[in-house]
């Protein structure tokens, strides 16, 4: 039940990836291209004045926006002002939309994938740390390998058309989401996750000196929760009944990299958040 922030340059098929995912699991897909002039109502929906032809009476009708879907691609979310960003992020957190004092509950499952372009920074509105924290994962999309790119060119410049089949239903996805939360976790695994997150905080107990030097802010409790949920999911996907510490370590990169805030010292030393997390994992 977490959302994902995808970071990658244009042309890496982020839209195709998400659209294909929505098709194979038979979910409603919606794409929102974020621009500087996008308004909150363009995402959540708006009220229109509607006239009843038979009675002549007029009333307001709520027209649902693109947020009323199961999988939403928020393309270049950092290109729109904070007010519009907040409209989507509120829906992500609360799973409902409020318009004109009326609450509209979103369909489940509800999953947002937001994208950011790491190259172009002019005219963008970076997401604040508090809003970045609402994304479970931060995934970096790399360029394809040479062989992968050859296969891509062959398939996309011919008449080849992939045939997609539904493999899951809404009900099955919700069942598996609940199943993950029923997976037992040993106390030492939870303690490891909490200790790992705690050591990202510059003022925490037992924080390494390099964290104090390179980070101005660490991850909050939500990171510990997502480390355990991610570890649970990884365990059952691999046919195991319970996660171990290695599962938590595998989740550390995508869960923590957008939750730690580097300072000027890290920038001066050319150290990224990913490198800091890797160094931290080597100390625990």
What are these model-predicted stretches?
Residues 9, 43, 115:
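P-loop (Walker A) phosphate-binding loop of NTP-binding proteins
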Residues 202-284:
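C-terminal engagement/docking regions of AAA+ P-loop ATPases
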Residues 1-36:
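Walker A/P-loop
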Residues 4, 72, 110:
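Conserved beta-strand position immediately N-terminal to the Walker
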Residues 8, 75-76, 87:
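Walker B catalytic acidic pair
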Residues 50-73:
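Conserved alpha-helical scaffold flanking the Walker A/P-loop in AAA+ ATPase domains
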